[in-house]
C-alpha cells in the first residue's frame, strides 16, 4: 500500500462546490454538479467535443481532434477532451466512442455526454471511501475502480433507457485519464491507444501500444464467448473478420468482443467490462494517439507516430492522420465501404 495524503488532498478540492454540496452525499446531486462543471468548461474553452483543438496554460498540454464520416451513412464516432477534468488543473480526460448498428450514433452521443459526469461521481465516491483510511491505494487503483464502476453504470443505463434501442446497437469506448504523470487507459472495444516515446538511441520516436484491440478471435475472448454458448463466425465477403453471434443468429454478429449495448449478445460472451492499464509518463514520452478502428485498419502504429512527428503545427496533427488514413483506405480497401475515422492527439508538454 502507498500513502497518498497529498494526492488525495488535491483530489478532494473537487468535493466542495459553490453551493457547498458534496458529490459523495448524493449521486444524483453529484451528476448535477458534474454537469455544471461541464458547462463551465465549455465556456472556458477547456472542453472539446468536435473537431478542433484545446490547450491548457496550467498543464501545458495540447490536444487535437478530427473526425471524418465514412461511406456507411451517419458518422457514428464521437470524441471528447476535457482539460481541467473535475476542476483539477493537472487532470485531462479523453474519450473515443465508436457506435455501430442502427442506433449506434445515438448511443455513442449519449455515452459521450454521460460518461464524464458518471466518472466524476464514481471517482469522488471511490476517493471518499479511500480517504477514510490512513493507508490508501495507488492513483492507478483509484482510477481503475472508478472506471470499472462507470463502465458498468453506463451499460446498465443504456439497457433500461426507454428512449434508446440498444438491443442490436451499441458503441465501443476508449478513455484516457492523465493526472500529472499518471496515465490510465480504459478500453472496451477495438479503438486503440498508442503512445510515442523517444527511442533508446534518442534519434527518433517509437510507438508503444497501450490497449488491446478486443476482437472475438483473441484466445481469451473466444474462450469466454464459447463458454457462454456464443458463436464465432466470419461473413463470406469478409473471411478474415471474426464476429460474435447468437447460437442460431444467422449472419447477425458483431466484430468486437467488448462494447456498450448490444444486449442481444450479452448472454453469449459480449461484455462491457474494460481492460484498465497504467503508464507512468516520463520525459521520454511525447504524445498519445487515440483513434477508432477506421484508422488502425489501414495504418500501423509506427506510421501514425511518424506522421504526427512530422506535423509542424500540432493543431493539425489529428487532421493529418485522418487525411492519410482516408488516402490509405481508398488505396488498400477500395472494395470495402470506408469506415468512420476519428483521431485524438494529446501532447504532454509544450513544443
Swiss-Prot record:
Show the catalytic activity.
O-phospho-L-seryl-[protein] + H2O = L-seryl-[protein] + phosphate; O-phospho-L-threonyl-[protein] + H2O = L-threonyl-[protein] + phosphate
Ranges where the PPM-type phosphatase domain occurs = 62-348
Q: Which GO terms describe its biological process?
A: drought recovery; microtubule cytoskeleton organization; negative regulation of growth; protein dephosphorylation
Per its record, what are the GO molecular function terms? metal ion binding; protein serine/threonine phosphatase activity
Q: What is its EC number?
A: 3.1.3.16
Q: Which domain of life is it from?
A: Eukaryota
Q: So where does Mn(2+) 1 get bound? A: 98-99
Question: Which SUPFAM superfamilies does this one have?
Answer: PP2C-like
- Sequence positions that bind Mn(2+) 2: 98, 293, 339
Which UniProt key words apply to this protein? Hydrolase, Magnesium, Manganese, Metal-binding, Protein phosphatase
Q: Extract the Gene3D superfamilies matched here.
A: PPM-type phosphatase domain
What cofactor is needed? Mg(2+); Mn(2+)
Q: Name one GO cellular component term.
A: nucleus
UniProt cross-references to Pfam families, sorted A to Z: PP2C
Q: Which InterPro entries match?
A: PP2C (IPR015655), PPM-type-like_dom_sf (IPR036457), PPM-type_phosphatase-like_dom (IPR001932)
Cofactor binding note: Binds 2 magnesium or manganese ions per subunit.
Q: Name the enzyme's class.
A: hydrolase
In the record, the note on similarity to other proteins reads: Belongs to the PP2C family.
Q: What is this protein called?
A: Probable protein phosphatase 2C 41
* Source species: Arabidopsis thaliana
Amino acid at each position: 500500500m502507498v500513502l497518498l495524503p497529498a494526492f488525495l488532498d488535491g483530489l478532494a478540492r473537487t468535493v466542495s462546490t459553490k453551493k457547498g454540496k458534496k458529490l459523495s452525499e448524493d449521486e444524483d446531486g453529484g451528476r448535477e454538479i458534474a454537469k455544471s462543471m461541464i458547462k463551465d468548461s465549455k465556456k472556458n474553452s477547456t472542453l472539446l467535443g468536435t473537431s478542433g483543438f484545446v490547450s491548457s496554460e496550467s498543464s501545458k498540454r495540447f490536444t487535437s481532434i478530427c473526425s471524418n464520416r465514412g461511406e456507411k451513412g451517419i458518422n457514428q464516432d464521437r470524441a471528447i477532451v476535457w482539460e481541467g477534468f473535475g476542476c483539477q488543473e493537472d487532470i485531462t480526460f479523453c474519450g473515443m466512442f465508436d457506435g455501430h448498428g442502427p442506433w449506434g450514433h445515438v448511443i455513442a452521443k449519449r455515452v459521450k455526454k454521460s460518461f464524464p459526469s458518471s466518472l466524476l461521481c464514481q471517482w469522488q465516491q471511490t476517493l471518499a471511501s479511500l480517504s477514510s483510511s490512513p493507508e490508501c491505494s495507488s492513483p492507478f487503483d483509484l482510477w481503475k475502480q472508478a472506471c470499472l464502476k462507470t463502465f458498468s453504470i453506463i451499460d446498465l443505463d443504456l439497457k433500461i433507457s426507454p428512449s434508446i434501442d440498444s438491443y442490436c446497437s451499441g458503441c465501443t469506448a476508449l478513455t484516457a485519464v492523465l493526472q500529472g504523470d499518471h496515465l490510465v487507459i480504459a478500453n472496451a472495444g477495438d479503438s486503440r491507444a498508442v503512445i510515442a516515446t523517444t527511442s533508446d538511441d534518442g534519434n527518433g520516436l517509437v510507438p508503444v501500444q497501450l490497449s488491446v484491440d478486443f476482437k472475438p478471435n483473441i484466445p481469451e475472448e473466444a474462450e469466454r464467448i464459447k463458454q457462454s454458448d456464443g458463436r464465432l463466425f466470419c461473413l463470406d465477403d469478409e473471411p478474415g473478420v471474426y464476429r460474435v453471434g447468437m447460437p442460431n443468429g444467422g449472419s447477425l454478429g458483431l466484430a468486437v468482443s467488448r462494447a456498450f449495448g448490444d444486449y442481444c449478445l450479452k448472454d453469449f460472451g459480449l461484455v462491457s467490462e474494460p481492460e484498465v492499464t497504467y503508464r507512468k509518463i516520463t520525459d521520454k514520452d511525447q504524445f498519445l494517439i487515440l483513434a477508432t478502428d477506421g484508422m488502425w485498419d489501414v495504418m500501423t502504429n509506427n506510421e501514425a507516430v511518424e506522421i504526427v512527428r512530422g506535423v509542424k503545427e500540432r493543431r493539425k496533427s489529428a487532421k493529418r492522420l485522418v487525411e492519410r488514413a482516408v488516402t490509405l483506405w481508398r488505396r488498400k480497401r477500395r472494395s470495402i465501404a470506408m469506415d468512420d475515422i476519428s483521431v485524438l492527439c494529446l501532447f504532454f508538454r509544450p513544443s
